[in-house]
Amino acid sequence: MFETNYWPFPDQAPNPFNAQVEQLSATENVYIFLTTLFGILQLVYVIFKLLCTMFPALHWSPIWRGLENFWLFLSLASLAIAYWWLPSMTFTGYWALTIIATILGLIMLIMMSVKFVSFVKLFYRTGSFAIAIRGPIVLVALDVTIKLHCTPFAILVKEVGNIFYLSEYCNKPLTAAQVAALRICVGGQWFAYTRSTTTSAAKVAAANSTAKYHLFVLQGVAEYTQLSSVKFE
C-alpha cells in the first residue's frame, strides 16, 4: 500500500503544538528565554524613562541613574548572549526573534515620542530652537567624550561611580580648574545650556548638581587613567 500524509484516526493524531515544544533543543530554550528577558528588561527601562520624565527629580538621583545604566547593560547583555546562539536557531527561534524585534520597535517609538515631547517643552519654555536641540547633544557629547578618552576599566569606574556617588558632593563649590575641565569636555557649552534653559532657583540647583556629578565621574576616571587633558586642583 502507498503511504498517505493524512492521519486515519483524527482523535489519535499528535498535537502539533506539543510536538513542536518537545522538539525544541536546550539551546533554543535558552535563546527564547534570553530574547524574552531582553524584551521584558527593555519594557522596564522604558518605564524608568517615563518616570524620569514625569518626576524630573529622579533624573538627578545618582542611585537611580546607576540602576538605569545597570538595567540597560543587563538587557543588552541578554540580547548579545542570545545572538550567540543565533546560528543554531530553527523556525521557532526566528519566530521568537520576530516578536522581540516588534516589541523593540514599539519601545523605540515610545522613546522617540518621549524625546520629542521633551524637545517641544524645552522649545516652548525657551523660545529658542538652538537651545532646545542643543540640550540633548551636550549631554551625549559629555558622555561620548568620557568614553573616547578612557580605557574599558575607566568606563567601568564611571558606571560604578553612578551608583556610589556621594550626594553631599553637590554642596561643594566648583573651583576654577574644575570649571575649566568641564568646559574642555563639552566645548564650553555646558554652563551656557544650564543658564539658558533653567528658569527657577530649583532648576538652577539641579543643573549645577548634574554638572558636579559629571565632574565627580571625570575625577574618578582621571585618577585611574591619568588623563592629560583634564587637570584638577
From Swiss-Prot:
Q: Which residues lie on this side of the membrane: Intravirion?
A: 53-69, 115-233
Q: Record's family?
A: Belongs to the torovirinae M protein family.
The protein's GO terms of the molecular function aspect are: structural constituent of virion
- UniProt entry tagged with the keyword Ubl conjugation: no
Q: What is this protein called?
A: Membrane protein
At the highest ranks, the source species' classification is: Viruses, Riboviria, Orthornavirae, Pisuviricota, Pisoniviricetes
Q: How does it assemble?
A: Interacts with many viral proteins in infected cells. Interacts with envelope E protein in the budding compartment of the host cell, which is located between endoplasmic reticulum and the Golgi complex. Forms a complex with HE and S proteins. Interacts with nucleocapsid N protein. This interaction probably participates in the viral mRNA packaging into the virus.
Record topology, Virion surface segments: 1-31, 91-93
Q: State its role.
A: Component of the viral envelope that plays a central role in virus morphogenesis and assembly via its interactions with other viral proteins.
Keywords per UniProt: Host Golgi apparatus, Host membrane, Membrane, Transmembrane, Transmembrane helix, Viral envelope protein, Viral matrix protein, Virion
Highest rank taxon of the organism: Viruses
Membrane-related topology note:
Multi-pass membrane protein
